[in-house]
Amino acid sequence: MVSIDLTTIPEEPGCYQFKDETGTILYVGKAKNLKKRVSSYFQKKSITPRIDILVSLIRDIDVIVTSSEVEALILENNLIKKYQPKYNIDLKDAKSYAFIQISNDPFPRIGIARDRTVKKTGTLYGPFVSAAERDQILKFVKQTFHLRTCKKMTKRACLRSHLGTCAAPCTGKISEPEYQYLVKSADYLLKGKSQDLIYDLRKEMETFAAAEEYEKALVIRDRIAAIENLSERQYVQRQKKSDEHIINYLVSGDTVYLILFHVERGSLTSKEEFVFPETEDFLDEFILQYYSSTKPPNELILPSLPGSGMEEYLTHIRGSHVTLTIPKQGEKKHLLDLAYKNLEVSFFTGKMRLAELGEALHMDTAPEVIECFDISHLRGTGTVASMVSFRDGKPDKRNYRRYKINSAGPSDDYAAMAEVVKRRYSRLLREKSPMPDLIVVDGGPGQLKSAHAILEELSLPIPIISIAKREEEIYIPGRNTPLSIQKKSPASLLIQEIRDEAHRFAITYQKKLRQKSIKE
């Protein structure tokens, strides 16, 4: 099984995405505690053969932290609808696409509908991929607005009526206009118009209070409190027809760590992460570069204003107005804070792994930039090499490189390693480009010796290690025995993760070349 580092996964609510070697999302899940839930997949005993197969395909895990379980639940629903992962519920199954329906009766009932064709008999809300989400929201609406659920109205009071959770129109306790007002309120909530609903309810509460109908005013007050509580937990999904991008960042040392949330029609659907050197106008530079190849959204939510003219520039690119917003409070500020929280989880748990790796290798400072080499061939033919770069513990794919090996003989991994290391660092020397802080080679002492000899030939005092596949043992130059680093420690797992990525990249390149040669 490929090594997956679980030490960086936070113990917070959120969603996790399992990805295969191509980056395709295999499975999306939610959790109250991400670390516990994700770790459970990698225990020795699994529940089903299907999970065994899923786990064997996992090469990467991405997480998005949320503020609550409800947010995680809604985000999971959005991600499953968008990506339709192979190992999630089959979205063609009508049961997984359940709706909430309010019927067209004079005294409408609320319930579950499993088919869009029933739309003629009422108003549909959804669909909901998660039954838990649907049931939770349905339960809230029933308890808050006391709509009936019975299929046929009788003249006898039901159990819900006795419990005070049904308005009981069947017994004449409520008039049709009064009941329709409750239906309208439920409709507002299910359409995401909770702020409009709260505004109307507050006016109604004030009217009752002014008329000294305090019991009715208290009922409305409790209803407002319940809706506000639900709304505070639903920042991840907001009823909007436009799209938004949320950008937040932090600067550490001379490096900018930036995260971008994609919000499509009110639903958080994905995130992107970036690392780059700090400059005086780094935010402006990022926006200009990113949106030169990506259509700007209707609204860009930021922690600070970019330079003047940026709004007009983005509007010009989009072809319609783009709004730049710097929120100080409210749901947009909450999303900005959520982006920052994910930023810390993504980058600074990685910093902790790097610090531990630096200590384990007795380096003066933690290695910010790590480059790793892997050799791949098919029965000694078509030898290729890959080099992957990790910056601050995260893949830096812009600096990945692929090589066809020219000088090494068939199955001569040592000569192939020497060739690729020499080509890489001779070029960096010619270009006067920065060198990595640490070099990792896939293999044992033999591959390490070949690579280290090239570094000495080039007079490059770069720390270098190797990692052997079977036992996950780490070697350093001049020593035939592996370092005493625990195989499941964050430092060792980070090296394994980097090595696995280099191996994946090399295999992908080799397959591509083989397919090309077959076509020719």
From Swiss-Prot:
Domain UVR: where? 195-230
User: Mind telling me what this protein is named?
Assistant: UvrABC system protein C
**UniProtKB keywords:** Cytoplasm, DNA damage, DNA excision, DNA repair, Excision nuclease, SOS response
Q: Does the keyword S-adenosyl-L-methionine apply?
A: no
Q: Show the PROSITE patterns listed in the entry.
A: GIY_YIG, UVR, UVRC
Tell me its family. Answer: Belongs to the UvrC family.
Where do the GIY-YIG domain residues begin and end? 11-89
Entry's Gene Ontology cellular component terms: cytoplasm; excinuclease repair complex
A Gene Ontology MF term for this entry? excinuclease ABC activity
Q: Give the domain of life.
A: Archaea
| Main localization, broad class | cytoplasm
Say if the entry is tagged with keyword RNA-binding: no
Disulfide bridge positions per record: none
Quote the Pfam families the UniProt record gives.
Answer: GIY-YIG, UVR, UvrC_RNaseH, UvrC_RNaseH_dom
Q: Indicate the transmembrane segments per the record.
A: none
Which biological process, per GO, is one annotated for this protein? nucleotide-excision repair
Cellular compartments annotated: Cytoplasm
> Which PANTHER family does its entry note?
UVRABC SYSTEM PROTEIN C, UVRC/OXIDOREDUCTASE
* Function summary: The UvrABC repair system catalyzes the recognition and processing of DNA lesions. UvrC both incises the 5' and 3' sides of the lesion. The N-terminal half is responsible for the 3' incision and the C-terminal half is responsible for the 5' incision.
Q: How does it assemble?
A: Interacts with UvrB in an incision complex.
